[in-house]
């Protein structure tokens, strides 16, 4: 009956609140527990907080690094206070990200490269004051240049707009929007 369903729902909510409320009890914020390292012939893979790991690496020892940074404050990646993606805004994010760029510059051999996966980020009228796109890749390039790096090149990774539309439900990708008002249409957002 409906009364039984309501009672089960209420009990389930109570249990969920109790379980979530106790989630952090007994957990220590121990940065050491996130560190790990694997090696093979001519390669080393580090796992851990990138800034903390980079601090442990000797100067001028890395030939090539590749990674995807947090996309500013677009997603919450973890509950860690150390996570640079847990930022209130772009300024705070780039202040934190700058520490990594400095460390990577220190540990990278002169003339060698780092490859960064990123993409343009959506702007929302409620949060950003206007709807559109932020040039996140350009912001990364400018920040890296301010830390001593030289921009080498950009590779565009094409994304299927139909798949993006199905995933994001963005009206700017719909054919009916093109017919209705093409000024509000856009192509799929590439990665870089």
Where are these regions (language model features)?
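A conserved SF2-helicase RecA2
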Residues: 1-25
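Core catalytic lobe of class I
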Residues: 24-192
């Amino acid at each position: 009956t409906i009364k039984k369903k309501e009672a089960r729902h209420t009990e389930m909510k109570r249990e969920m609140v109790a379980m979530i409320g106790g989630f952090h009890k007994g957990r220590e914020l121990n940065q050491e527990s996130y560190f790990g390292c694997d090696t093979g012939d001519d390669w080393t893979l580090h796992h851990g907080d990138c800034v903390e790991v980079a601090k442990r690496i000797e100067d001028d020892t890395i030939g090539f690094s590749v990674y995807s940074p947090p996309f500013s404050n677009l997603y919450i990646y973890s509950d860690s206070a150390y996570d640079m993606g847990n930022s209130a805004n772009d300024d705070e994010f780039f202040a934190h990200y700058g520490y990594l760029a400095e460390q990577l510059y220190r540990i990278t051999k002169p003339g060698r490269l780092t490859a960064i996966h990123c993409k343009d980020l959506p702007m929302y009228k409620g949060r950003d004051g206007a709807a559109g796109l932020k040039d996140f890749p350009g912001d990364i390039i400018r920040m890296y240049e301010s830390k001593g790096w030289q921009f080498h090149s950009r590779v565009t990774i094409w994304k299927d707009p139909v798949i993006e539309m199905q995933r994001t439900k963005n009206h700017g990708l719909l054919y009916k929007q093109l017919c209705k008002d093409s000024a509000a249409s856009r192509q799929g957002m590439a990665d870089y």
